[in-house]
A protein has these predicted regions:
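Long, low-complexity or tandemly repetitive, helically biased scaffold regions used
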Residues: 1-132
């Protein structure tokens, strides 16, 4: 039987903190991707989605100190920068919305706002490498 490697005791609390932050980040992502219409739903209005996105990312930013630890400092800094950049892109989109020109433009804008949050994948991978 294969056993999953355990996270070191000193990283359990930071890992729980990361999970709490990721829950907010995922809710923010879901808010933005909900703007894209599907065959069954028209898509959330962009202004409404941006407000929800910013609220969830602000919540994520407030939770960030919970997972800061020397072993994951580089990843923590990357995630902090990713949140700040995504919030800045959302602010610019809210204050000066571009002409989207249809479905492709909307997809591009959503991708641009979400791209900095890819840093969280590196953080999750770092925690996986720290298991013993």
């Amino acid at each position: 039987m294969l056993r999953r490697k355990a996270i070191p005791e000193n990283l359990r609390s930071p890992l729980d903190g990361l999970r709490a932050v990721v829950a907010e980040v995922e809710a923010a992502r879901a808010a933005m991707t909900a703007t894209v219409p599907s065959t069954r739903l028209p898509g959330t209005p962009l202004a409404e989605a941006i407000a929800e996105f910013e609220a969830h990312l602000t919540g994520a930013r407030d939770l960030m100190p919970r997972w800061r630890a020397p072993e994951v400092e580089e990843e923590w800094l990357g995630c902090e920068a990713g949140i700040e950049e995504s919030l800045e892109r959302a602010r610019r989109l809210r204050e000066d919305p571009p002409e989207l020109g249809g479905f492709e433009g909307l997809i591009w804008v959503v991708d641009q706002v979400l791209a900095p949050l890819e840093a969280f994948e590196a953080a999750a991978e770092r925690f996986r490498t720290l298991r013993r």
